[in-house]
Amino acid sequence: MTKYKLEYIWLDGYTPTPNLRGKTQIKEFASFPTLEQLPLWGFDGSSTQQAEGHSSDCVLKPVAVFPDAARTNGVLVMCEVMMPDGKTPHASNKRATILDDAGAWFGFEQEYFFYKDGRPLGFPTSGYPAPQGPYYTGVGFSNVGDVARKIVEEHLDLCLAAGINHEGINAEVAKGQWEFQIFGKGSKKAADEMWMARYLMLRLTEKYGIDIEFHCKPLGDTDWNGSGMHANFSTEYMRTVGGKEYFEALMAAFDKNLMDHIAVYGPDNDKRLTGKHETAPWNKFSYGVADRGASIRVPHSFVNNGYKGYLEDRRPNSQGDPYQIASQILKTISSVPTEKKAVA
């Protein structure tokens, strides 16, 4: 038997953006534990905005498990928060009620800033560095500094070791801004892995004395890009049948449900979605081929393949909850009728 360090991780009850929480217990197993072997656990909900002090018990229900390469015999356990009966989802538990479809594929592009001493990493003590231009996918100390790349490479390795479907990294448009991409089949799986990747980044940067800033527009109304979490999505029907008529009906549905999407695409999006810095205005829906200034970017490959494949919704922001984002996208897609065609 081996003693494993089980890190139970969950989302707290803070609004509009939940925080990640985690605590460790030690359990013995003959080998790396399966999800079915992991027990329910409890925590003090009165300290996480999820209960009152006079009745503070909440329950953690494991829903996904990953190896933790940062610890000897480490296990990362993604959890849903349940009421004391262990069966009823807590009001803050969005995962329990979202739409899911294994045939729906999601690729999230998580942008963020490294922050040190209250400002983006690489910014001078006062004022600003050289304007945007050389930082996006840049190399060299003057562009990315001396520690950021070390962190993103270490984070990449931690994600891959955990079995997270991490698909890439790059320096972003603003100084101190980076991005990583997570892909998953099914909204719950994709979102589980994105939340776990966020957790690993936050935990990793502790030892560097650096914070992660997920706010979508941390530098305010300046000529510096904000941060998004663009959502690339497709369903089996979009990939195998599609067609221009279906695509146009789909875009009409996204237009009709504009405000439902904005409501779950992350707080303060009006500060980011201004029509500048590769964004579309938050209150107007648009789409265009290869257009990074549109609400939805349509890849050339999608059109060239007979309007089949994936699309990119560029409106979700860097603080958005991937559970709710994926669910809303599926909800809108499900409102559009599909022809009953055989899939070749």
From Swiss-Prot:
User: Which residues belong to any copy of the GS catalytic domain?
Assistant: 89-344
Provide the top EC class: ligase
Q: Which UniProt keywords apply?
A: ATP-binding, Cytoplasm, Ligase, Magnesium, Metal-binding, Nitrogen fixation, Nucleotide-binding
The biological process GO terms on file are:
glutamine biosynthetic process; nitrogen fixation
Catalyzes what?
L-glutamate + NH4(+) + ATP = L-glutamine + ADP + phosphate + H(+)
Pfam hit, one: Gln-synt_C
Q: Which GO terms describe its molecular function?
A: ATP binding; glutamine synthetase activity; metal ion binding
Q: Indicate which residues the UniProt annotation says bind ATP.
A: E167
**What is the required cofactor set for this protein?**
Mg(2+)
This protein's source sits in the domain of life called Bacteria
Identify the residues that bind L-glutamate.
E278
Q: Where in the cell is it found?
A: Cytoplasm
Primary place of residence?
cytoplasm
Of the GO CC terms on this record, one is: cytoplasm
Any idea which positions bind Mg(2+)? E109, E111, E172, E179
- Annotated Gene3D superfamilies: Glutamine synthetase, N-terminal domain (3.10.20.70), Glutamine synthetase/guanido kinase, catalytic domain (3.30.590.10)
**Magnesium as a keyword?**
yes
User: In this protein, which residues make up the domain named GS beta-grasp?
Assistant: 4-86
Record's miscellaneous remark: Two forms of glutamine synthetase (GSI and GSII) can be found in this nitrogen fixing bacteria, GSI is a typical prokaryotic glutamine synthetase whereas GSII is similar to the eukaryotic enzyme.
- Role, per record: Catalyzes the ATP-dependent biosynthesis of glutamine from glutamate and ammonia.
- Subunit composition? Homooctamer and homotetramer.
Report the sequence similarity comment from the record. Belongs to the glutamine synthetase family.
Protein name as catalogued: Glutamine synthetase
Source organism per entry reads Bradyrhizobium diazoefficiens (strain JCM 10833 / BCRC 13528 / IAM 13628 / NBRC 14792 / USDA 110)
Its taxonomic path starts at: Bacteria, Pseudomonadati, Pseudomonadota, Alphaproteobacteria, Hyphomicrobiales
